[in-house]
Amino acid sequence: MEAEGSSAPARAGSGEGSDSAGGATLKAPKHLWRHEQHHQYPLRQPQFRLLHPHHHLPPPPPPSPQPQPQCPLQPPPPPPLPPPPPPPGAARGRYASSGATGRVRHRGYSDTERYLYCRAMDRTSYAVETGHRPGLKKSRMSWPSSFQGLRRFDVDNGTSAGRSPLDPMTSPGSGLILQANFVHSQRRESFLYRSDSDYDLSPKSMSRNSSIASDIHGDDLIVTPFAQVLASLRTVRNNFAALTNLQDRAPSKRSPMCNQPSINKATITEEAYQKLASETLEELDWCLDQLETLQTRHSVSEMASNKFKRMLNRELTHLSEMSRSGNQVSEFISNTFLDKQHEVEIPSPTQKEKEKKKRPMSQISGVKKLMHSSSLTNSSIPRFGVKTEQEDVLAKELEDVNKWGLHVFRIAELSGNRPLTVIMHTIFQERDLLKTFKIPVDTLITYLMTLEDHYHADVAYHNNIHAADVVQSTHVLLSTPALEAVFTDLEILAAIFASAIHDVDHPGVSNQFLINTNSELALMYNDSSVLENHHLAVGFKLLQEENCDIFQNLTKKQRQSLRKMVIDIVLATDMSKHMNLLADLKTMVETKKVTSSGVLLLDNYSDRIQVLQNMVHCADLSNPTKPLQLYRQWTDRIMEEFFRQGDRERERGMEISPMCDKHNASVEKSQVGFIDYIVHPLWETWADLVHPDAQDILDTLEDNREWYQSTIPQSPSPAPDDPEEGRQGQTEKFQFELTLEEDGESDTEKDSGSQVEEDTSCSDSKTLCTQDSESTEIPLDEQVEEEAVGEEEESQPEACVIDDRSPDT
């Protein structure tokens, strides 16, 4: 950690008031703050500094020497720098909007924090030196540069009665200690850290007091409104204590945590006193303004969700004005990830479809009758669950099952296209889940093979290989050092099982396509997360097949808890819920950062499931974070799936969904936009949660973005020759409104001045233009309609999907 503090003096000339060893001066004018915001992708340069909490006041005399603690939390303070004279207008104003970003600086650490830190360091040292991982048979070295040899993560393993509502008797650690983010190299920040104001490249105003709101997170910027309110209120409290000479009273949990001499009115000038009082009042007024906008029926995280959507709309509007391809990428991202309400004209069904839709909906479509159990016995089960002539080569590949970037396509080749069965079986063995939950190995293999058979081999992206990739990615994320011993075995089982079933029976089209075509599934699930609901129904229904109930030995309470968790996790893979999910996680992380403890307790179901939901969501959106060779293969597959949907839409006379028209789609630009506006903000937030364990993942993500950026053609793509095919590109540029309605319908955003119909299907589903799209697209109707258009195949049941047809038998 010494290296992290060495860069503290580097900010002397950054335009911000420099800090002395004992105090701080007023900040420079707003136009000098975070000058790097003028770059399209600002560079984040957090610093480790110690500031006096009452930074408006002159620094106190240096304290008497204190004995060094056995396990210090911070490096020695940097040498004092002469503060520059405050320029005119340097007085800081309160937040002008909820888009203001607050800077949180170090103040010191309490005895409790030092104890927790030292305790965690002891456990971390043991884990690093021995490779020990509770619940895992092998040492996990999945984080080579972020984990090995470093002692910078911390998980408190103290007991907490009833901490997990799912399994209070076996719930492990009591929380996750959020670490300060010291970036080893300059990295781009996501658009979330830009100004939340139109045509203003620098933050409107950083709360003058938010910079002292946290003891642990030195220069971390806070961008979620609720966390900013908390930071400001903590500053108001500290200033009030200074103004009223109340800081000598018994300290509370909200008191400044560093030992500082008492400050009373006599120690400062009357001018400084009045200035501090005025700024405190302004800060309090800003907090009141923010709280007055809250609505009782909405959560505080919706403040962040509305803000992020407003900022994304502004970014997409700018992108759409640059070129036709930029307009298409903007429309795709908006339709897919902003959960818009679509007004569409539903086409009339064909006669054949009418006949099929007369059948009852009492059965779950897509479930096939398969017999895998008859040939399986405990003595005949192969080493990896499937028979293969290349078992030794497969074993070599599976040695990387605990590492980020497993070559899942190679696993599929070596296993006879059974990657899901092989990887799930290996992970269950690694984590000893078979023994923990008394799962018969033949039952596990039977279920896995049955589940894998219900993924469609003719779907380019949403198939069994994608499911295996998400399972393995979730497995690695669960093993991240920061989350060690945080989740129970039942929660781990739920996350892995949810990853395995999250796209089962996916037909290769989006949710919106199913809605637009008036599919049976859309009717059954009321147009709400159509595919995600179907994936859950099929995944649980298959447990009822012969010798497939892998949860047969769980208690009733365990089964109920697991089912609830799996449902919550899979429904969260609906890409239209992305911004809400991101806002919830970022609000939770930043709220804990600005509190005195900085500890994320995860002591209730809501917080714990939120982390698991985001974990699987990250795994589902992990393609751009994998090695470029794998990422490019996934990109080719998702684009092939998109183009197939576009061809079906063209045949039906429907408007072609964004990024689904093979004649004018910009693949490279779509990947860059997808990373900038969706993947990077998500992984950036996850990296904050588990810092520093995901730094290598962010590095790979940035490298991949730069590669795709370098491949974008310099000249604009020519207009298509066929006016029929190019009609979508000839429409007006897609525009996005810059403000959201305050009536609570935060997810509903109307397009201003644009004729673009958002009914296009490619959007609302998990169709990530670049990488793994999520379980949002299921083209039931499409396949049905395709059948009607094709030759007479009524006698052939399609194992393919959930359609209005009867299940295969």
Curated annotation (Swiss-Prot):
AMP binds at H462, D503, D620, N623, Q671, F674. Its cofactor is Zn(2+); Mg(2+); Mn(2+). Binds 2 divalent metal cations per subunit. Site 1 may preferentially bind zinc ions. Binds 2 divalent metal cations per subunit. Site 2 has a preference for magnesium and/or manganese ions. It catalyses: 3',5'-cyclic AMP + H2O = AMP + H(+). InterPro entries: PDE4_UCR (IPR040844), PDEase (IPR023088), PDEase_catalytic_dom (IPR002073), PDEase_catalytic_dom_sf (IPR036971), PDEase_CS (IPR023174). The keyword Iron does not apply. Mn(2+) binds at D503. Residues 386-715 form the PDEase domain. Mg(2+) binds at D503. Residues 58-89 have a biased composition (Pro residues). GO terms for biological process: adrenergic receptor signaling pathway; cAMP catabolic process; cAMP-mediated signaling; cellular response to cAMP; cellular response to epinephrine stimulus; establishment of endothelial barrier; negative regulation of adenylate cyclase-activating G protein-coupled receptor signaling pathway; negative regulation of heart contraction. It is an enzyme of class 3 (hydrolase). The active site is at H462. The keyword 4Fe-4S does not apply. There is a cross-link at K387 (Glycyl lysine isopeptide (Lys-Gly) (interchain with G-Cter in SUMO)). Residues 779-796 have a biased composition (Acidic residues). Residues 762-773 have a biased composition (Polar residues). Residues 1-107, 343-364, 710-729, 739-809 are annotated as: Disordered. Pathway: Purine metabolism; 3',5'-cyclic AMP degradation; AMP from 3',5'-cyclic AMP: step 1/1. 3',5'-cyclic AMP binds at H462, Q671, F674. GO terms for cellular component: apical plasma membrane; calcium channel complex; centrosome; cilium; cytosol; membrane; nuclear membrane; nucleoplasm. Zn(2+) 1 binds at H466, H502, D503, D620. It is found in: Apical cell membrane; Cytoplasm; Membrane; Cytoplasm, Cytoskeleton. It is linked to Genetic variations in PDE4D might be associated with susceptibility to stroke. PubMed:17006457 states that association with stroke has to be considered with caution. Hydrolyzes the second messenger cAMP, which is a key regulator of many important physiological processes. This is 3',5'-cyclic-AMP phosphodiesterase 4D. The lineage of its organism: Eukaryota, Metazoa, Chordata, Craniata, Vertebrata.
